[in-house]
Regions:
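Ligand/cofactor pocket segment of small-molecule handling proteins
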Residues: 99, 111-120
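Conserved small/polar residues in nucleotide/adenosyl-binding loops
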Residues: 122-126
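Short active-site loop/helix that positions an aromatic residue
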Residues: 100-108
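An anion-binding catalytic pocket shared by soluble metabolic enzymes
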Residues: 4-94, 101, 112
Length: 126
C-alpha cells in the first residue's frame, strides 16, 4: 500500500484529535505530505476517526488527483494542498473544529496575542 507509514499516522493522530475533543464526529481533517514523492495522505470524507483504518486514508497529488485509495478525500483537500504548495517546509496539516475555537469564531471577537512567540511566527502578507 502506497505511503503506509503516513496513512498510519493520519489514523493515529485522527484518533488522538477526537479523543482530545478537538473535533467531533466526522469534522476536521489531517494530512501528511511526503515531499520526496510529492504526495499527500489525507483523511477520508465523512468518516469517524475511531472507525478509520489506514486503507481508508486517501493518497493524492498536489493538484487534488487521487493516486491511491477507495474513499473520497476530505472536502478540505484544497486547503491542505495549498499549504504544501506555498509553504515548502510544511509536512502536515491538522484542521480541527474544537468547541472552544468554534465558539470564539462565532462570537467574532479578536483574539489578542498573549505570548511573544506568536510575533516570531508572523509573516507579512506581501
Amino acid at each position: 500500500m502506497l505511503m503506509q507509514e503516513e496513512r498510519e499516522l493520519v489514523v493515529e493522530y485522527g484518533k488522538k484529535m477526537s479523543a482530545a475533543r478537538l473535533s467531533t464526529g466526522t469534522s476536521g481533517n489531517i494530512s501528511i505530505y511526503n515531499a520526496e514523492k510529492g504526495l499527500v495522505a489525507l483523511s477520508p470524507s465523512g468518516m469517524d476517526y475511531f472507525s478509520t483504518t489506514p486503507e481508508d486514508v486517501v493518497i493524492l497529488d498536489l493538484d487534488g488527483k487521487v493516486v491511491d485509495g477507495k474513499r473520497k478525500p476530505s472536502s478540505e483537500w484544497a486547503l491542505h494542498t495549498t499549504f504544501y504548495k506555498h509553504k515548502p517546509h510544511a509536512r502536515a496539516v491538522v484542521h480541527t473544529h474544537s468547541v472552544y475555537c468554534t465558539t470564539l469564531a462565532v462570537l467574532g471577537e479578536p483574539i489578542r496575542a498573549v505570548h511573544y512567540v506568536i510575533c516570531l511566527l508572523y509573516t507579512s502578507p506581501s
